[in-house]
Amino acid sequence: VASRGLGDVYKRQGNYRLVEHYDSHWNPLPDFNIDKPNDPFKPYGSTPGHWLEWAKLCLQIYGLDSTQTWSLPTAESLFKAADEAWMPGYVYTVDWQGFPVCSYRFWWPITEAIGTAHFLSQITNESQYKEAYEHLWNFADQYFIDHDYGVWFYELDDNLHPVSRTWFGKPDLYHVYQAALYCDVSYKDGFAQGLINKSNF
């Protein structure tokens, strides 16, 4: 499924904005929910956080089977493509020309970016990915992490201030927990196996 949907992303010359919605016959619906651009689960446009998530998953595919040669360049292309959504922090959605539709900054895209940057650094040993990993963590530490009460803020406004427009409270833990674990696991392992392999865990 991943290779069919993503296998030529790095050849598309800019057509990396992934379609989010399809009908029952897998025909793309690029205008789905155009009248509800801020929908928290089915928004109009393309979601850069999902580009980052797919990039991370492609690297895990590469870790399981390095003969899937499409997976590494696809991950690199998607990771770099998400730069267009950094304003700073990743905006929730962009239109098909790359302009922001919903400029909310949610917590989960940066956690996916942290994992992707870490795995790319492991695989390529390129300094740009190590620097990206550190930059993303510094941004998260400054704006998303709630140092008074723990966990993360789940949404920031355009001025990077915490707000509660979409969710109230702190409804999600697994994204931020994963972000904290990436430094201890390899792209070749899932979280459980990776942590088992750590003798100090």
Descriptions of predicted regions:
Residues 1-10:
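Single conserved hydrophobic/aromatic residue that forms the stacking wall/gate
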Residues 23-28, 48-51, 82-90:
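A glycine-rich, aromatic-flanked flexible loop/lid motif
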Residues 19-20, 72:
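Short beta-strand segments
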Residues 11-18, 27, 84-89, 142-150:
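Proline-centered turn/helix-capping motifs that create local helix->coil transitions or kinks
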Residues 9, 15, 21, 153, ...:
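Intrinsically disordered, low-complexity N-terminal regions enriched in serine/proline/glycine
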Residues 91-94, 146-159:
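A glycine-biased, small/acidic residue-tolerant capping/turn segment at secondary-structure junctions
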Residues 3-4, 29-80, 96-142, 158-201:
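Aromatic (Trp/Tyr) and acidic
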